Amino acid sequence: MLPASPKMEHKAVVFLLLLFLKSGLGDLLDDYVNTQGASLLSLSRKNLAGRSVEDCAAKCEEETDFVCRAFQYHSKEQQCVVMAENSKNTPVFRMRDVILYEKRIYLLECKTGNGQTYRGTTAETKSGVTCQKWSATSPHVPKFSPEKFPLAGLEENYCRNPDNDENGPWCYTTDPDKRYDYCDIPECEDKCMHCSGENYEGKIAKTMSGRDCQAWDSQSPHAHGYIPSKFPNKNLKMNYCRNPDGEPRPWCFTTDPQKRWEFCDIPRCTTPPPSSGPKYQCLKGTGKNYGGTVAVTESGHTCQRWSEQTPHKHNRTPENFPCKNLEENYCRNPNGEKAPWCYTTNSEVRWEYCTIPSCESSPLSTERMDVPVPPEQTPVPQDCYHGNGQSYRGTSSTTITGRKCQSWSSMTPHRHLKTPENYPNAGLTMNYCRNPDADKSPWCYTTDPRVRWEFCNLKKCSETPEQVPAAPQAPGVENPPEADCMIGTGKSYRGKKATTVAGVPCQEWAAQEPHQHSIFTPETNPQSGLERNYCRNPDGDVNGPWCYTMNPRKPFDYCDVPQCESSFDCGKPKVEPKKCSGRIVGGCVSKPHSWPWQVSLRRSSRHFCGGTLISPKWVLTAAHCLDNILALSFYKVILGAHNEKVREQSVQEIPVSRLFREPSQADIALLKLSRPAIITKEVIPACLPPPNYMVAARTECYITGWGETQGTFGEGLLKEAHLPVIENKVCNRNEYLDGRVKPTELCAGHLIGGTDSCQGDSGGPLVCFEKDKYILQGVTSWGLGCARPNKPGVYVRVSPYVPWIEETMRRN
């Protein structure tokens, strides 16, 4: 029997204060999770006028007809939609020009403190009994009801704590013999951590030794690759302790120049951790939830027990990772690898992947057996799209703002219905840009939780003659008013296109029919060229020029304005690279001239190192390539080559006139050419990064070269390989490069091995795609062998040396 409590007798009740209400509107928005391009199909909603996001947030807080859990803001229509539902219980759809704001408190399935503010959807007690609805009177007549306590969140039969009970959320039960019972709600990770603290969101900002944490958005005193904007789902706020890389517990970079990083002392939560989902005896996805008993690697090695340190020492122990199911010596995937793996009992082989039967072919799996799986379609190289891009089957997987596309078969971070099963003829392969619903151009869901979808960074195939400026334009110079093409997002477009992509005439900017508006008028935006009904981009929309339409049911739409063809811009190849995902040992042969900045350094006509064209007269390479240099007359630079063993028509051969080594002995050097290279579609410079720019960890980059292939394939042909950047903190672990990597160097590679630069690739480029161009971020420098497991390649960071590079070129 439970003791007597306020739940059984009348007692004065402390009225609940909604803790998420703040005094300032700016603070109020901190209590919302926002997602661009997302819309809810809510049944309880109101459409209201709203001039700003803050205005809409205030209207949501003031709503009295229902509990407002979310709102949508439509900037071009100046409209708020306040709603009773959120994404937990209502389908989410993609929509243009909308940002969905959801109250964080209604998305959480955990409690803070005693759970007085808990608004989750758990509806059963600790003992597994279903909760009675708060509005019901059977089997128990409640003392706490929605009518008496309208601010207590007494919805449906969800667990709540309307009387501030110190034991946490509870509910009346559907068992006639048990009036009420407590619910098993996990603690939110703001004061404590579950598992290894991957989801810790607290504000502890000191390390175990008492050092202050360095802010995540700072690069001083320690430069690093955990840039908050590149890790939107890791909550890298302020200088709070976090765990973005799968360590045993949260940590931070420190403000002590002598101590790069250190663990933080975060207490463990006393409640059970949230469920990680069902365990499978077969391989589903990457095997994150594999719970089978396979204990042999793919090459036949027996697995080492996770709790043991011989023959291989490691920190991936059951004690450090209590929620990763590291039992016995069974294959597991505790760190997000491509498949389950284990340390081996062979002292010469540290770890290997395991061969696990797939759930798709396993009799143990009955999930979705009735759904036909479309055949895998082979993507074809395509540099542009025709029409609205429904037929596009290329391999581009980057959005117009540079975000990476989410796989069409994945539901993380965005759940959706545009799957290969639902759209079998739409070519929804991998995470490639597609147009399954006949939008204006190819698009994709993004891997950024804050941005549901975006159009892709693809140009439309055009029959229009190229418009090449007579001379390069200075930064900031706009395209001529008469040009009916746009540069960038078209904010400076002043052409006369006046119909939408669907062919609907545009409404005049000064008119208020059929659509009323007040923000984008000639009076409010006198510098935006809002003349007549011409397509314009007054708000800098990343999707380009738009207009209000003459269709009363369609407030606005985008216009089909082509990009102006410019002269050869740095980092923009005229041939779309293959970007093979293969693992230049083990890479793939590149498409000819798709990496037009690649240079072959020749000594007596023989290739010995790579290099990168960074301007018509300058090449960047590795200093160690020039250690035993003879007279400069022996050296030539070869540009525009694909097959280094054949003299191709596109090749330019230029002697080297001067050599400049970096003065602090970094492995980087500049070569001045005796004459400028002729910029063609086969010869284009790569872009330099901003000074001291840090490449984010896990950024996908590419290396190219003619180096040693160790008998793989493609001898003599330029090869490419895709490599993720590895944070120096990880790369310098004992099992990898053991502290050898300097702050002015970066690591990139697949830790399993199989892909790497090798002899002859030294000095060549490591380029990373940023928004719409390739940036030279690294110069191939050194490695411990070629493509060895656990030994990624090391590259000189280019950004710290940009001031020296620019000054050297300016003076010479």
Swiss-Prot record:
Which positions does UniProt annotate with glycan attachment? N315, S365
On this chain, the residues bearing Phosphoserine are S600
Q: Which residues form a coiled coil?
A: none
Kringle domain location: 110-188, 192-269, 282-359, 384-461, 485-564
Q: What is this protein called?
A: Plasminogen
Q: Subunit comment for this entry?
A: Interacts with CSPG4 and AMOT. Interacts (via the Kringle domains) with HRG; the interaction tethers PLG to the cell surface and enhances its activation. Interacts (via Kringle 4 domain) with ADA; the interaction stimulates PLG activation when in complex with DPP4. Angiostatin: Interacts with ATP5F1A; the interaction inhibits most of the angiogenic effects of angiostatin.
Q: Which GO terms describe its molecular function?
A: endopeptidase activity; protein domain specific binding; serine-type endopeptidase activity; signaling receptor binding
Catalytic activity line of the entry: Preferential cleavage: Lys-|-Xaa > Arg-|-Xaa, higher selectivity than trypsin. Converts fibrin into soluble products
Q: What is known of its domains?
A: Kringle domains mediate interaction with CSPG4.
Active-site feature positions: H624, D667, S762
| Species whose genome carries this gene | Bos taurus (Bovine)
Gene encoding this chain? PLG
Output the lineage of the source organism.
Eukaryota, Metazoa, Chordata, Craniata, Vertebrata
